[in-house]
Amino acid sequence: MSRVGNKAIEVPNAVKVDIKDRNFISVEGPKGKLEYQFNHRLTITNENKVITVKRPNDEIFMKKIHGTTRALLSNMVEGVSKGFQKTLKIVGLAYRAQIKDKQLILSLGFSHPVSVAIPDNLEVVVNQNTEIVIKGIDKQLVGEFAAKNVKLRKPEPYKGKGIRYVGQYVRQKAGKSAKKTRKD
């Protein structure tokens, strides 16, 4: 029994949900519009501003897809009403970020600046050259873009330099200790 899949999704008043062709749903709200094509064997209903997802049987595949579809629909409703945001912090001497022509340009200690194309449906803001705020309506796209940037220079364990999520704990290691000389 999928506990996630059986939960109903409450739809805010500002959000409009449209189910077409038994396997296509579009969710539109104040922040934008998202569309999703789900498995045709699932049944999705939208009654009285409440979305429910039902599966036809208890096959293992259907149980998996049931919970996943419900979670994706919930994220779509939240995304078009409130939106999603991830904040990254750049730590390191002379490490900085800037935006130029829909490109995020990062100076991360390499011999050249690294430029990353910003997707059309994301909004990226750089604060004080060391903080990157990524906003969007698609949770997966926001998380993917943030992870792609963190991967460029992961926080290293000795000084903590690199790109990290705000609030992320980076475990620090002790450096080499000086060699002790022994007197006999």
Swiss-Prot record:
Q: Which InterPro entries match?
A: Ribosomal_uL6-like, Ribosomal_uL6-like_a/b-dom_sf, Ribosomal_uL6_a/b-dom, Ribosomal_uL6_bac-type, Ribosomal_uL6_CS
Pfam families this protein is in?
A: Ribosomal_L6
Annotated keywords = Ribonucleoprotein, Ribosomal protein, RNA-binding, rRNA-binding
One GO MF term on file is: structural constituent of ribosome
Which Gene Ontology terms describe the biological processes this protein takes part in? cytoplasmic translation
What the entry lists under PROSITE patterns is as follows: RIBOSOMAL_L6_1
GO CC annotations? cytosolic large ribosomal subunit
Organism domain of life:
Bacteria
Q: Which family does it belong to?
A: Belongs to the universal ribosomal protein uL6 family.
Q: Which purpose does this protein serve, as stated in its record?
A: This protein binds to the 23S rRNA, and is important in its secondary structure. It is located near the subunit interface in the base of the L7/L12 stalk, and near the tRNA binding site of the peptidyltransferase center.
Its quaternary organisation is: Part of the 50S ribosomal subunit.
The name of this protein is Large ribosomal subunit protein uL6
What species is given as this protein's source?
Onion yellows phytoplasma (strain OY-M)
